[in-house]
Structure formats: structure tokens, C-alpha cells
UniProtKB/Swiss-Prot annotation:
Protein name: 2-hydroxyacyl-CoA lyase 2
InterPro entries listed in its UniProt record: DHS-like_NAD/FAD-binding_dom (IPR029035), THDP-binding (IPR029061), Thiamin_PyroP_enz_cen_dom (IPR012000), Thiamin_PyroP_enz_TPP-bd_dom (IPR012001), TPP-bd_CS (IPR000399), TPP_enz (IPR045229), TPP_enzyme_TPP-bd (IPR011766)
E.C. numbers: 4.1.2.-
Cofactor binding: number and manner: Binds 1 Mg(2+) ion per subunit. Binds 1 thiamine pyrophosphate per subunit.
Length: 621
């Protein structure tokens, strides 16, 4: 290599280094975009503007200094700020809003422990496929990794839990980052997204400038370099911050079945004599209205088993809704349509499916679509697409065709026999206190037609799932496949805000109540009255039922018959203690609770219950 070539390469490398450094330091951007040093505006306003343009009505939070600008700006734009007593509750409330409103639920929490407190709730949203945006505060951009207050590697925590994670580095990035996150949350298989906002991207220039002002910097050349670097960093942070940007929602991508796939399924369904449909929560996702799905199912005339958020889709007493004997029905079925239903533990990993049956599986998520298909079952047709729109297209293509009526009738007859047997168990006297099945039947009979039921617990809630009947679509909220305890307070809060005229019930076990009983304070402060039905048997019964006979000890399963109703009173609600001596007045107490709830009081019914064998053999691991 001659000297001229060597010099040319060296100059090229040097020039490339200068250009790269200029880009990283924002020098090139600053040449063309102004830094408005006198502007009182702050990054929280940009966040609020994007949220408003996307139809966000609520932001759930537990306040912290890192995120205060976002909360203040949202309030000024008419977005309601709802503060809870635990960060997990804020995320659960956002999850409920996402499920019931068809939009993205939003929670904002402070840095460090504020964010770590949300991990379980975010994982629950991921597994329940709920589109929500988690906003987290963070240490200032220059202080991350340097031991700042509440500074941890938050991105590593949330990358496994979220579809999209971003850390905003300049104020100008806020709008495009939030727009992108909201679109990703709703696209494909919905799920949570996370954006980290360093504190210096949220406060006004003059506030951040004070923090960046050089203090005790070295003298001489090094001091000048540090001062220049800090000044440039600040300028780049705010360069182009307040330029006009598009705030509108980005397109949302939803996968759909192809015409050929629908046609193949039409042929299979038209030949079936004993088809069944298993609907999961995915069947209720936007954009297909739940009422349209109901009409499609009624047109098909195929018996349906409803799970998760699809409970209530067919109303209270549909002849097509089969609630009992699912295993037997699947054994006899010659065609099974899994509409958003997954072959996990809830279907014994696919082992309950008849190998001779034709199986149509529809799911937005490929991994869920084919889960355990390598071992226990094989789909005849597997469609990675939206279950709701698929059912509509299938119904239209099969117009005029209905399932043979004797098949759903026979399943309904078996259903009625099992329901009668279950009712007989409710009439049995327990050794002490009230029969929980009887209590649940009484409540179910008195539920308002617009009621929303929130399920949070193990044994008592498991019984409620058999007995209590949601009156309509999107009227049942449970955690989903993760089986998380502690969703009750947040789910009920979100549900009541979405549907303020509806009667919202939380069905609690006495164990699960302990997670969110403090949210009675939230219900009172934010005027979101709900009714909590607590099955109090002083035990973690879901675990105790198997632990005692298998291992011979009730260790860690025992609780006390605690006065939870007094706690509700202390938080500004109204509590009732209900024991066996109150059995004859139970209906009157329930009606009184409903009346007080309508008048604005959150109510807790602390019902002392005894033991039954109704759920022997139920899954706890």
C-alpha cells in the first residue's frame, strides 16, 4: 500500500468517525432543528397528547416523581387519572379496560420498585393477550447505570414479558414511540408493551438545565470538555421537541383466515353430525362485535362450550350453551372447532380430544395454535387468524345449514341432569356455617342483567364458575391461563369505570381478598362502587384439599375467620358479616347491598362458609 492510499484510508476512517460521533451526539440533528430553551412545555404533554388522540380515557397509576409530568398533562387534557394502592392493581385495572373497551389500557408507574411491583400483572396480561401500555419512569439519561435513585436495568425485566419495549432518549422520540407501541399492542396477538421514560425527557428545559449545570468540574481542558458535553447533551435532548408531529393511530394488523381455509372448514362442518365449538377469550377480541359473533353461532346451531372472556357470549339460557360434561362431549364429537381455545392444562394438553375427530384450530398466535400438537392431538386444519371474524365468515358460507338438532338437544339434556345434581349439593347442610354453593346460587338468582362478574380466587371462585351465569358478552373477567390471585380490585375498578351503570361483583376467596382489600379505599375515593362477595372458610382450600390427604399436613393453609367487613367499613365502604344464623335473611342482605352500591357505596359481604366435596379432584398445580 503506497502512502497516498494509506492517507486516503486514514482520512476516510477519520471522517467516518467524525460523522458517526456527530450523529451519536445529535450534532447533525441540531443543525436543522431548534432547541427552544425558553419553552415551558415538557415531555409529559407529548405523552398525554398521543394518548388522547388514541381514545385513552383512563390512566391508572400509583404516583411517583419520575412520572408526575405525564399524570398532570393527562389530567389537563381530560384523561382521568385513577390512583390505586398498589402498582399491580393499576396494571390489572388497565387490563380490564383493554378487555372491555376494545382499546389499549394504560398504566403509569414510577421507576425501580414501582415497576418491579407490576411484573406479575404484566405477565398475566401477556398470557391473557390483553393490549396494554405500561409507562415507567427511569433515572435521567446521563445517570443510568451510575447508581441513581431507583435505577435498575428495567428493559431486561420487561423484554420477556412485552411485545415491544423502548427507552426514550430524547423528547422528540416520545410521539413516534408511543404511537408505535400502541399499534403493536393491538396487532397480531394483543399483549402488553412497555416504554421507559427517563426523568429528563419529561420535565421542562429549565428544570432539566438546573440538574445538568456543571458542578465542581475539573479546571482546564477537561473541564471545558465536560461542560461542552453536558450542554450539547441538553440541547440534543430538547432539539426539535415541539415540532408538529402526527398523533393519529397507526394501522393495526390483524391476521385473518384465507378464503381457501374458510372453504375447507365449510366442507368439514357441513359433513359433521356431532360438531362442538370451544370458544376462548380470543373470540371476543376486536374488531368483530360480540353480538355479531353470537348471531353467527346461533345461525350455525352448533353446541358451544365457553371459556374465559367468551363466557356470557350466548346469554344466560341459550340452548346452544353447554356448561357441563365437556369431556364426554369431546369424546363423542366428530368435529371440534377450537376458536381461540388452547390445548394447555385446561384441555389436558389436548388429550381430551378424540383422535378420530376432525379438529379445526383458529388462533392468532402460532405457538398457541399448535401447542402440544406434537404429542397429544393433531389439527385437521390449523388457521393462524382471528377467531371472531372466522366464525362470521364460516356462518355466512354455511348460510342455510344447521347442525342436526338432536345433537345439541342430547348435550343439553345431560347438562340439565348435571345442573340438577349440582343444585342438590347446594341444598345439603355443611358441618358449620353456610353451604357455599347455596350462597352462590342465591347471588346468581339476584344478579342484575347488566352485571359484570370478576373472579379472583381458588376454591370458592371455582365453584362460582359452575354456578354463576354471566348475562351477556364481556360480563365475566378472570385472570386467564396464568391463574393469578389478586386481580379482583384492579379488574373491578377498570370494569366499573368502563361501564359505570353496570353492577360489578368481585367473587373473592378469603385468601385472594388479602391482596387487594386495600382497594376499597380506591373504590371510595374514586366513587366506583362495587360489591365484593367473600367466601370465608378460613383456609386456602384449593391447596388444602389435596395437601392434607396426600402429605398429611395442613401447614400454611390455615387462615382465620377475619372480620373483613370491618376493613371495608374502615376504608369508607359498607361491610356485612353473614353466617348460618343469617341464612333466612340472605336474600334481603344481598338486595340491600345492591341498593347501597347503586347509591355509591362499595360493599363487602363477608360470608362464613363451610366445606363441601363439590370440587374434589380439581386442578391446583
Amino acid at each position: 500500500m503506497d502512502i497516498s492510499m494509506y492517507l486516503g484510508c486514514s482520512l476516510g476512517a477519520a471522517l467516518g468517525g467524525v460523522i458517526f460521533a456527530s450523529y451519536k451526539l445529535g450534532l447533525l440533528y441540531q443543525l436543522f432543528h431548534k432547541t427552544e430553551r425558553q419553552s415551558p412545555r415538557h415531555g409529559g404533554e407529548s405523552v398525554a397528547e398521543v394518548l388522547r388522540s388514541h381514545g385513552v380515557k383512563f390512566v391508572f397509576t400509583l404516583v411517583g416523581g419520575h412520572i408526575s409530568p405525564i399524570l398532570v398533562a393527562c389530567e389537563k387534557l381530560g384523561i382521568r387519572i385513577v390512583d390505586t394502592r398498589h402498582e399491580a392493581t393499576a396494571v390489572f385495572a388497565a387490563d380490564a379496560v383493554a378487555r372491555l373497551s376494545g382499546t389499549v389500557g394504560v398504566a403509569a408507574v414510577t421507576a425501580g420498585p414501582g415497576l418491579t411491583n407490576t411484573v406479575t400483572a404484566v405477565k398475566n396480561a401477556q398470557m391473557a393477550e390483553s393490549p396494554l401500555l405500561l409507562i415507567g419512569g427511569a433515572a435521567a439519561t446521563l445517570l443510568q447505570g451510575r447508581g441513581a435513585l431507583q435505577d435498575i436495568d428495567q428493559m431486561s425485566l420487561f423484554k420477556p414479558l412485552c411485545k415491544f419495549c423502548a427507552s426514550v432518549r430524547t423528547v422528540r422520540e416520545i410521539v413516534p414511540t408511543v404511537r408505535k407501541a400502541l399499534a403493536i399492542a393491538q396487532s397480531g396477538t394483543p399483549g402488553p408493551v412497555f416504554i421507559e421514560f427517563p426523568i429528563d425527557t419529561l420535565y421542562p428545559y429549565h428544570v432539566v438545565e438546573k440538574e445538568f449545570a456543571p458542578k465542581n468540574t475539573p479546571k482546564g481542558l477537561m473541564g471545558k470538555i465536560i461542560a461542552w458535553y453536558l450542554k450539547n447533551h441538553l440541547s440534543n435532548l430538547f432539539a426539535g421537541a415541539w415540532e408538529s408531529r402526527d398523533l393519529s393511530p397507526l394501522p393495526v394488523h390483524i391476521p385473518h383466515a384465507t378464503d381457501d381455509q374458510v372453504q375447507r372448514c365449510v366442507e368439514l362442518v357441513s359433513r359433521a353430525k356431532k360438531p362442538v365449538i370451544l370458544l376462548g377469550s380470543q373470540a371476543t377480541l376486536p374488531p368483530t362485535p360480540a353480538d355479531d359473533i353470537r348471531k353467527a353461532l346461533e345461525s350455525l346451531g352448533i353446541p358451544c362450550f365457553l371459556g374465559g372472556m367468551s363466557r356470557g357470549l350466548l346469554g344466560k339460557n341459550s340452548p346452544l350453551h353447554i356448561r357441563q360434561n365437556r369431556r364426554d362431549a369431546l369424546k363423542d364429537a366428530d368435529l371440534v372447532l377450537l376458536a381461540g381455545t388452547v390445548c394447555d392444562f385446561r384441555l389436558s394438553y389436548g388429550r381430551v380430544l378424540n383422535r378420530r375427530s376432525k379438529i379445526i384450530a383458529v388462533n392468532r398466535d402460532k405457538s398457541q395454535l399448535l401447542k402440544n400438537s406434537d404429542m397429544f392431538w393433531k389439527p385437521t386444519v390449523a388457521i393462524q387468524g382471528d377467531a371472531g371474524s372466522f366464525l362470521l365468515n364460516l356462518s355466512k358460507a354455511l348460510k342455510g345449514h344447521r347442525c342436526p338438532e338432536e345433537w345439541p338437544q342430547s348435550l343439553k339434556e345431560g347438562d340439565n341432569v348435571k345442573e340438577k345434581a349440582n343444585r342438590a349439593k347446594a341444598d345439603e347442610k355443611t358441618e358449620r356455617h353456610l353451604n357455599p354453593l347455596s350462597v352462590l346460587h342465591r347471588v346468581d338468582e339476584l344478579l342484575a342483567e347488566d352485571s359484570i362478574i370478576v373472579a379472583d380466587g381458588g376454591d370458592f371462585v371455582g365453584s362460582a364458575a359452575y354456578i354463576m351465569r354471566p348475562r351477556g358478552p364481556l360480563c365475566w373477567l378472570d385472570p386467564g391461563a396464568f391463574g393469578t390471585l389478586g386481580v379482583g380490585g384492579g379488574f373491578a375498578l377498570g370494569a366499573k369505570l368502563c361501564r359505570p351503570e353496570s353492577e360489578v361483583w368481585i367473587v373473592y376467596g378469603d385468601g385472594s381478598l388479602g391482596y387487594t382489600v386495600a382497594e376499597f379505599d380506591t373504590f371510595t375515593r374514586h366513587k366506583t362502587p362495587v360489591i365484593a362477595l367473600v367466601g370465608n372458610d378460613a383456609c386456602w382450600s384449593q391447596i388444602s384439599r389435596e395437601q392434607v390427604p396426600m402429605l398429611g399436613s395442613n401447614v400454611a393453609c390455615g387462615l382465620a375467620f377475619t372480620d373483613y367487613h370491618v376493613v371495608a367499613d374502615g376504608y369508607g365502604g359498607k361491610g356485612y358479616l353473614i353466617g348460618r344464623e343469617d341464612e333466612s335473611q340472605l336474600e334481603d342482605i344481598i338486595k340491600k347491598a345492591q341498593k347501597e352500591c347503586k347509591e355509591g357505596k362499595a360493599v363487602l359481604l363477608n360470608v362464613l362458609i363451610g366445606k363441601t366435596n363439590f370440587r374434589e379432584g380439581s386442578i391446583s398445580v
